[in-house]
Amino acid sequence: MESIQSTMKNINLYDIKAAVRKAQNVVMNYTSMEARVREATNNEPWGASTSLMMEIAQGTHNYSQLNEILPMIYRRFTEKTAEEWRQIYKALQLLEFLVKNGSERVVDDARAHQATIKMLRNFHYIDHRQKDQGLNVRTRAKELVELLNDSERIRKERKRARQNRGKFIGVGSDGDSRISTSSKSRFPSFGSSRGSYRTRVYGDGGGFTDYGNGYHDSSSMSDSRDASDNDVEEYNEDGDGGSSDAATANSTRGSRRTTTKQSDKAPEQPKQESAMIDLLGLDNEPSPAQPQTNTSAPLAFEDDGFGDFQSSAAAPASSTLNNASLFMGSQTASTAAKNDDDAFDDFQSAPSAKPASNTAAFSSISFGGFNSLNQLPTSSSAFTPQPTTFNTGYTSAFGMSSGLSNTSSQAGLGLTSQQPTAAKSSGSNGDAFGSLWSSAVNKVHQENSTRERVVSSSSEPVSKTQNFLDNDNLLL
């Protein structure tokens, strides 16, 4: 009881009027949308809320609800007296809101009832305070008529209202998220919320446009137009950004060009690499090894890697004699001479493996016996190209071997150090190439004097060096 008494004390006149309106809605069997219109156009001294008018605007996209909203508004214009000017004023305000935010069908229907709206431009009412309250109604009616007659202004106002609606909702001007989409589930009607009829609509493009599929579709078409306009603006913004991106792209291209120009100047590196490879000893560089032959005696025998082409003729007879005496009896003086003088004699060392007493033929054989093919006798001016046969049994044609003579068999393996020297001297006198070799030996005899001293002083290091030279010759 106390709660009922407290509520009764807090009830005022406006609460009683609201309860009376609810009762009238039930008695008069008004629909929910008609009840909202009656609430938005009541006689209270305050205006209708924006949320309530937005719900009514959503209902205009439905065909059945649209036929409930607009007739109720027009009844406010005609059925109300001058004393209820607030309801007339609120009805004009709601109709203007629907023209800007509602369906495009509202514009067509309002233009059809434009005569009723023009009558309100002459509305007069002076209250008990001698105040002209009809001024607000006349002003609002005049503005609404001007809006309905200006199609360009309607397009601008609808576009502005759509942008404001997007700001309040927080979605923007995207047509996918609209308040009108919620009207499908909130205010169901017969069939689909999309109109199945075809009629002329008032498009945002200006004036009466082509036939659309319905109220909802025409609104979505206008929304799509607006979205396309926004897309164009975004495209312009992207175009500006694209120009900046193009500038950055040009700068990057310029940097790439500079890098390519710098990279074109780099082919000098392979030459440096080739110089490094030469330092490793893969190319012909015999000159650094020659000064070492004069300074140190053990290194004198190590300069025959590629220098044997020039130093083969510079070998003295005494050095070949000493080198031949260091080996055992199985190795003859001729074999030692070949190992010391010739760089390519190892490839044809088979004929030299047999001992021979008369070594005069070896003086005419150099580089594996290739030079003994065209031996010219010094005594006669004319000669016949026949192979010259010595006492040893060798034929000079490409180093072909023959049977040994009696002197070679009697000589055996024991050779003295004086026999090769005599053979060298005798062979050089009878052969033109031998004389050349002997003259070369006489010229470099002084340079090889140090080599003879080392060979005579120590025999074992010389043999090791000789083996090392033989291995190098095999590698060649």
From Swiss-Prot:
Phosphoprotein as UniProt keyword: yes
UniProt modified residues of type Phosphotyrosine: Y235
Keywords: Phosphoprotein
Low complexity bias locations: 178-198, 213-222
Basic and acidic residues bias: start-end ranges: 262-271, 444-454
Cross-referenced CDD domains: ENTH_Ent3
Any Pfam family the entry gives: ENTH
Species the sequence originates in: Schizosaccharomyces pombe (strain 972 / ATCC 24843) (Fission yeast)
GO molecular function, one term: clathrin binding
Protein name: ENTH domain-containing protein C794.11c
Chain segments carrying region Disordered: 157-198, 213-308, 410-429, 444-472
GO annotation (BP), single: retrograde transport, endosome to Golgi
Keyword hit for Phosphoprotein: yes
GO CC field: actin cortical patch; clathrin vesicle coat; cytosol; endosome; Golgi apparatus; plasma membrane; trans-Golgi network
Signal peptide: none
Sites bearing Phosphoserine, chain numbering: S173, S228, S243, S244, S459
Positions with biased composition (Acidic residues): 229-240
Annotated SUPFAM superfamilies: ENTH/VHS domain
